[in-house]
Amino acid sequence: MNSQKHLENTMLIVMGDHAQTLNGDHGGGTSEEVETCLFAWMPRSLPSSISSIFHPSTCGLGLNGKNICTSTMQQLDFAVSISALLGIPFPFGSIGRVNPELYALSPGSWDRQWLPASFYEDPSSDLKMWKNNYAHVLCINSWQVKRYIDSYSATSVMGFPSDDLHYITKLYNEAQSRWSDSKNRSCKPENGTIDEFSDFLLSFATLARSAWTEFDMKLMGVGLGIFIISIIFHLFVFERVQSLSNVYDNKTQKSSNHLQIYVAFLLVAVRAVSFLSNSYILAEGRVANFLLATTAIGSIRSSLVYGKIKKHDLVFLILIILIRFGIEKGMSKQAATNPFLNYDSGSDFDLKWLPSLFEGHDFVTLLPEISPMIILFLLSFLSCKYITSTVHSRCIKWVVTVGTMLSYLFIATFWLSERSFAPKMVYVIGLSLFVLNFVLRYLGILEKGETVQRLRSLALVMVSAWSPTILILLGKQGPFVVLVCIIAGWSIISSKNKGLLDDCKMGPISVMQWSLLAICLFYQTGHWCTFDGLRYGAAFIGFDEFKVVRQAILLFVDTFGISHILPIFSLPFLVTIPNSSSSKGRDKTVIFLNLTQVYLLYGLITAITTTFTVLCVAIQRRHLMVWGLFAPKYVFDAIGLLLTDVLICVSALYYC
């Protein structure tokens, strides 16, 4: 390039994204991993006056005998520095400062060829020209940052402290005043102008860094301590309820139940400790599916000890395999555009897995349209059958059955015609049934019958109120996912009642399986623990206009419906569907103690895993992917824990 005259004003800039340690690690928070290298070169030699901008300690002779300067700059300054060199507007969200050394490499910042001849007589005119240009660039740079500060302060919930904002504003006003004075002195800016603009930019960068990237270790320690104390208290209450249950149930054989508790907490510990690995967070659905399959294989092995494999264990294992394939689809980056996960009435099944023998035939064309309808019809039949056989009150039975059937009819209507009124009717019916459940519950209308029968009816009515809304938000994958959820739940309950531990009214392993199944369904339905993993299209099913509260509620139900709402409200089935021989004559106190154990254990499992998520985020707070990976995972788990606690409290008010 030195020999090419027309390239003398060319600048070459090469920058890496980040570096790595000597052993190849490149994702952590050490200086070796987060720092990078920037190489800037131009064929044109700098005037001696401009070379004085570079500190003497940073420059020296290279291997080729030419002068090479090595300095440092904040990565925050890169975007605005390149924008200044290219002569394009500064990015609005950038709060960096144009780097003086990088800016000095550009001949356009000090070249005198367009200035009067008198400038050529002064050797220092290059430096004066550069100072004038650099001060002008910093003025625009500061104006852009100040505009961002004002916009952020006006829209942010937290914002910056008022004292800090007042100080930053004062620095900006002083710099602007000096710049205005310098413009009135025949283009002779003083060093003070550059210094004051630099002070303003550096001061705000420090303030922003302290507010956005520096963490309060004391508050983090307090929060983590609260988590640990709550878990200890949770364990104490669980053990207390376990002891009371044994006393009321006249149990003398406790070893088998304790063995289940140890195995369940071993699985919880394996999953929780795995959160300390960023690789696990990226494959959480697969690992949860693996742990769930481990419990199924263990149940089959236990059956083999008695010489017979139970059909529900085989069905459960087959379902887990099917769920694994669904997780692979849901966790793929193409999930957002996967037709299986769409919301409209078009094709919702990926036909690539079908043999080429069937491609082009009517069967392949009709399958995506027919199969969701067939499964939806099957779900409506099962709902009608179990509601009529479980709920004894004729009035409640009629209302719930008609409401559920109408909801399924509106879902089918929406898929066939895309009429927006159909989803709205589903939402109204679901909300009405939910409110009606609580009203009838506290009026005493649902208090008839034995305790087990009453709890079973309450749980079935509650699940029937929520299922259609969650189903329509999931799209045409909804019927298949809900059917898988029902069959898997039946397998878990059957395994609890017919396994080795027939005397246990509350199976810890069954609760653990219930929790793992909920996690698997979350990922199978195409959700991610990232903000771009939210299925925003679900929030507009039935609506064309955007309303913040309405769309937020629908998006929230779509995200947490299949993984939190349905699993938690259906937990009473683990207690109320025992063997027929053991269900008769069960004391009411024992039943509610067992139900309390189930909810305590489910909440404890969620609390332990969330605690390790918090610990992982605290450890990885300086990681390169902290905002892209760990922070979203923390947000999802924290909201999931809060929702779990709220739903458990609602369940306690509703079922007890």
Feature annotation, model-predicted:
Residues 28, 61-67, 230, 470:
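Short interface patches used for recognition in eukaryotic signaling and trafficking proteins
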Residues 3-7, 84, 88, 92, ...:
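Short amphipathic alpha-helical interaction elements and helix-loop-helix interfaces
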Residues 24-27, 50-51, 94:
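Short, solvent-exposed loop/turn and secondary-structure capping segments
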